[in-house]
């Protein structure tokens, strides 16, 4: 009599539920991989100082704006200056420091009205790894608004009998361009002024002498205000002073003097542009 073979047990079929679970598992793995890719491939944002908003290891760039109001500025000129300053605020790269300064006549130096880094406005941040909305709010409240307020204050009239532009630039070079943190940073200085240096050590008014750099080198101001701009680019926004409709100084020779002065102090002359209305 033939022996009965035991019936083979069939493995349970995967079924739709099992297939769905497998797909969900694969989707989770893929999503996790994508998130990890974004997290590790996105450049890490630097740690910022709570007060200055600059990276704790120093700003990536430094932009200083020196506004000279030792003489009144025409309304048209003021409007153009405000427009240019607003452009600087809104286009400053992230993690660059913006320092807005005016002449400190009494102290024979400069005075800072605002000095902070752009912390970034949230543009380009990932929703996965950052919070663009909070970054935007911080940029507005901690950077944009106070910088705009300082910008308006910088053009307030402060008429004076002297104009220590060289001393102010020397002060800026010591404060902003000489530190180890600023050594490798891109450095730019904008000077908004008629550029007429007038102190007891040296004056550029016609009654004091010509605009030659040689005359300046023979004055006490040459050694007193000699400085190191550490390769900073200096850009002049030139205000033309007039008497009876005629320029007070020869603008071409005047700008040439300042080009020589900047280069003699280890800076880069970035050009001069005449402002409207003056």
Pin down the residues of each PLM region.
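Von Willebrand factor
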Residues: 57-184, 188-189
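Extracytoplasmic/luminal low-complexity segments enriched in Pro/Gly and acidic/polar residues
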Residues: 230-278
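VWA/integrin I-like adhesion module and closely mimicked acidic/polar interface patches used
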Residues: 38-41, 196-250
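Acidic/histidine-rich, surface-exposed loop or edge segments in extracytoplasmic proteins
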Residues: 58-72, 148-154, 237-242
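DG-centered beta-turn motif at the end of beta-strands
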Residues: 67-69, 172, 186-198
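Acidic, polar low-complexity linker/tail segments
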Residues: 8-64, 70-77, 90
């Amino acid at each position: 009599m033939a022996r009965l073979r035991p019936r083979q047990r069939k493995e349970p079929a995967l079924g739709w539920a099992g297939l769905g679970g497998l797909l969900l598992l694969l989707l989770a793995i893929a999503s996790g991989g994508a998130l990890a890719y974004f997290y590790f491939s996105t450049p890490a944002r630097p740690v910022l100082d709570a007060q200055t908003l600059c990276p704790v290891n120093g700003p990536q760039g430094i932009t200083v704006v020196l506004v000279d109001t030792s003489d009144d500025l025409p309304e048209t000129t003021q409007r153009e200056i405000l427009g240019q300053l607003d452009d600087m605020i809104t286009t400053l790269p992230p993690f660059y420091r913006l320092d807005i300064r005016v002449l400190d006549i009494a102290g024979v130096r400069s005075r800072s009205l605002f000095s902070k880094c752009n912390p970034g406005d949230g543009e380009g941040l990932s929703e996965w790894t950052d919070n663009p909305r909070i970054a935007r709010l911080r940029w507005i409240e901690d950077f944009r608004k106070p910088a705009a307020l300082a910008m308006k204050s910088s053009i307030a009239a402060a008429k004076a009998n002297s104009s220590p532009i060289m001393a102010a630039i020397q002060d800026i070079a010591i404060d902003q361009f000489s530190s180890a943190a600023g050594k490798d940073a891109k450095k730019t200085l904008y000077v908004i002024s008629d550029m007429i240096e007038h102190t007891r050590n040296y004056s550029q008014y016609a009654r004091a002498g010509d605009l030659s750099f040689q005359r300046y080198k023979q004055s006490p101001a040459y050694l007193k205000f000699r400085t190191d701009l550490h390769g900073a680019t200096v850009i002049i926004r030139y205000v033309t002073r007039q008497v009876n409709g005629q320029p007070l100084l020869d603008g071409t020779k005047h700008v040439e003097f300042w080009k020589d002065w900047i280069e003699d102090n280890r800076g880069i002359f970035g050009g001069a542009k005449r402002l409207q209305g003056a």
